[in-house]
Amino acid sequence: MLYSKKKEFVKFLEGIYKNANTIVAIHYHGLTVAQLTQIRKDLRVSGARLKIVKNTLAKIAVANLKVKQVDIFSGPIAIAYSEDYITVPKVILRFADQYPSLKVVGGFVDQKVATMNDIEQLASLATSESHKGNFLSLLQIPIRRFATVSHAPLVKLVTILKNYVNNKS
């Protein structure tokens, strides 16, 4: 890789560290190309990305940002990142259960070092979409109750008229 390309890649990684709220580093040795592609697709669907990184360049990018130095950059490493806190840990841990050769080695949350325990805790949280769905269903409860209450007299009237017609016959 040319020196100019390396500098460009370091700037790219610095941008990821600055802008992504959650970064999870994975050791992907032993995964097939198809498996990595599937992980990328699932991450992309949820608004996240996966990038294979060169360890020395990743270390330089982390050092430039004055983030606490971590020893997660050794061996074949990829980083999954997103602005959403929950998406990346959920997807990566689901694939880690599915593919034993995929190992989560650490990460960053809000530019602070995250342990495996931190990542597991984030993955256990509900997504923002489920929170939005719960909120919307709560908003619908009064509307449903109003519809039921306003509809009840009509149903009673129809029942009375039906009984009246049946008694006349």
Curated annotation (Swiss-Prot):
Pfam families in the record:
Ribosomal_L10 (PF00466)
User: Has the keyword Heme been applied to this entry?
Assistant: no
**UniProt cross-references to PROSITE patterns, sorted A to Z:** RIBOSOMAL_L10
The protein's superkingdom reads: Bacteria
Q: Which UniProt keywords apply?
A: Ribonucleoprotein, Ribosomal protein, RNA-binding, rRNA-binding
Molecular function (GO) terms listed?
A: large ribosomal subunit rRNA binding; structural constituent of ribosome
Looking up SUPFAM superfamilies in the UniProt record yields:
Ribosomal protein L10-like
Q: Does the keyword Ribonucleoprotein apply?
A: yes
List the record's Gene Ontology CC terms alphabetically.
large ribosomal subunit
A GO BP annotation = translation
Concerning HAMAP family, the annotation shows: Ribosomal_uL10 (MF_00362)
Family, per entry: Belongs to the universal ribosomal protein uL10 family.
Q: What does this protein do?
A: Forms part of the ribosomal stalk, playing a central role in the interaction of the ribosome with GTP-bound translation factors.
Q: How does it assemble?
A: Part of the ribosomal stalk of the 50S ribosomal subunit. The N-terminus interacts with L11 and the large rRNA to form the base of the stalk. The C-terminus forms an elongated spine to which L12 dimers bind in a sequential fashion forming a multimeric L10(L12)X complex.
Q: Which NCBIfam families does the entry link to?
A: PRK00099.1-1
Q: What name does the UniProt record give this protein?
A: Large ribosomal subunit protein uL10
- Which source organism does the UniProt entry give? Orientia tsutsugamushi (strain Ikeda)
